[in-house]
C-alpha cells in the first residue's frame, strides 16, 4: 500500500497529502499549534453583557470613538483572516505549518465575529 501511495504522490504535480501529527519535522509547529489551540475562544462564550454598566458610563463621544475603533478592528481582522494569514500558505515549509496558518486565519475570523456581538449589544442598549 505504501508503495502505491508513494507512486501516486510522485506522479502528481501538486499532490494532496494527509498531515501526520505523530511525525512533526519542525517542533516549533507543534509549539505554536498548542499555544493557538490553548488560547481558543468563541465570542458566544464571553459575557459581553457584563460590560453594560461600564458602557453606560461612557459619554456619547466615547461610545462613538469605541465603535469606530471596533469597526476598524473588524476590518483588520477580516483582512487578516481572508488575505493575510492565507497569503502565507504558499511559503509553508510543512503541512503542520500550513495547519498553523489556517488556524490563525480561522481565529482572525472569530475575532471579526466577536465585534459583531459587541455591535449588536451596544445597539440594543444605546
Which residues are covered by each model-predicted region?
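Alpha-helical bundle segments that constitute or directly flank the non-heme di-iron/ferroxidase center
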Residues: 59-90, 110-113
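Amphipathic alpha-helical hairpins
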Residues: 96-118
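Extreme N-terminal leader/anchor segments
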Residues: 1-49, 56-58, 62, 93-99
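Conserved small/polar residues in nucleotide/adenosyl-binding loops
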Residues: 124-126
